[in-house]
């Protein structure tokens, strides 16, 4: 029997709705990955509602929880770490310490850093210290990074002028250490208004993917968290990078189709679960 992969997901959690782990854990489980959720914050709801309650996890709790997993002899069974929204740079450093411990216990373990800073239409949501940490420290450790356009712009200190410029910016981030960069949401002058575009960039090649852009009265939150989680999960399940990239785009589109059909603000993950596991649509990544 083929072993089920195990993934430690260190990101935010909301009690109501879907963001961070609340957007990613169930879909990752649904496609066949055992997920160990470690919540960096626990909020009542995501912050686009403009009001919320809850608390940020103290940075020292992250190594303490990883110590607990090590104490029961399970740390070496962790195949990957996924990190998302950080409440502080100190939280980020605690995560990198945990990644180092896991890679020592399992040298094949992977680390995907989703450098959450905000959304091109919603603005930056983290302090400058977190942005600096992600670029100067996390990028050197991560196997994969999955920025959106706002985050890529922040890393580059400028906005792109074209698709080739987006590619150059992604390659500059790649040069800091990761094996692959997935740009989850491209935005550049001249981009078709009816398309949603993504990039996959490695040292050897790059691929561009376009899918239809779906209209919503209010853009759902958690799409980037869902994207990063599914991409890493498909890698753990045996996909190559391009296959994981294409699957992720299709599965996320299926969720958005269901969400749009229901007129929902929150992602319709439960209703779309079979289409997450077996997308009916397919989008081809074109090599650039």
From Swiss-Prot:
The keyword Kinase applies. InterPro entries: PM/HMP-P_kinase-1, PyrdxlKinase, Pyridoxal_kinase_PdxY, Ribokinase-like. It comes from the Bacteria. GO terms for cellular component: cytosol. Belongs to the pyridoxine kinase family. PdxY subfamily. Pyridoxal kinase involved in the salvage pathway of pyridoxal 5'-phosphate (PLP). Catalyzes the phosphorylation of pyridoxal to PLP. One of its GO terms (biological process) is pyridoxal 5'-phosphate salvage. One of its GO terms (molecular function) is pyridoxal kinase activity. It catalyses: pyridoxal + ATP = pyridoxal 5'-phosphate + ADP + H(+). Its cofactor is Mg(2+). Pfam families: Phos_pyr_kin. PANTHER family: PYRIDOXAL KINASE. This is Pyridoxal kinase PdxY. Keywords: ATP-binding, Kinase, Magnesium, Nucleotide-binding, Transferase. Its EC number is 2.7.1.35. Pathway: Cofactor metabolism; pyridoxal 5'-phosphate salvage; pyridoxal 5'-phosphate from pyridoxal: step 1/1. Homodimer. ATP binds at residues 114, 151, 184, 211-214. Substrate binds at residues 12, 47-48, 225.
């Amino acid at each position: 029997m083929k072993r089920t992969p195990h993934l430690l997901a260190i990101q935010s959690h909301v009690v109501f709705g879907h963001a961070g782990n609340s957007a990613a854990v169930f879909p990752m489980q649904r496609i066949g990955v055992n997920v160990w959720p470690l919540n960096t914050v626990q909020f009542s709801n995501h912050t686009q509602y403009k009001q919320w309650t809850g608390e940020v996890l103290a940075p020292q709790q992250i190594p303490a929880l990883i110590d607990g997993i090590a104490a029961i002899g399970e740390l070496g069974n962790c195949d990957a770490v996924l990190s998302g929204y950080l409440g502080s740079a100190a939280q980020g450093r605690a995560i990198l310490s945990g990644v180092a411990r896991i890679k020592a216990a399992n040298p094949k373990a992977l680390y995907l850093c989703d450098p959450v800073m905000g959304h091109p239409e919603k603005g930056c949501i983290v302090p400058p210290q977190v942005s600096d940490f992600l670029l100067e420290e996390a990028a050197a450790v991560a196997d994969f990074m999955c920025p959106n356009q706002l985050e890529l712009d922040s890393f580059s200190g400028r906005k792109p002028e074209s698709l080739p410029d987006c590619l150059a910016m992604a390659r500059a981030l790649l040069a800091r250490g990761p094996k692959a960069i997935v740009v989850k949401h491209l935005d550049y002058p001249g981009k078709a208004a009816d398309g949603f575009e993504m990039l996959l960039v490695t040292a050897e090649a790059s691929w561009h993917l376009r899918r239809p852009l779906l209209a919503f009265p209010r853009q759902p939150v958690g799409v980037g968290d869902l994207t990063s989680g599914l991409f890493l999960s498909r890698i753990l399940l045996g996909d190559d990078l391009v296959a994981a990239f294409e699957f992720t785009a299709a599965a996320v589109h299926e969720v958005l189709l269901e969400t749009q059909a229901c007129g929902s603000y929150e992602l319709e993950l439960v209703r779309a679960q079979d289409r997450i596991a077996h997308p009916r649509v397919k989008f081809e990544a074109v090599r650039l």
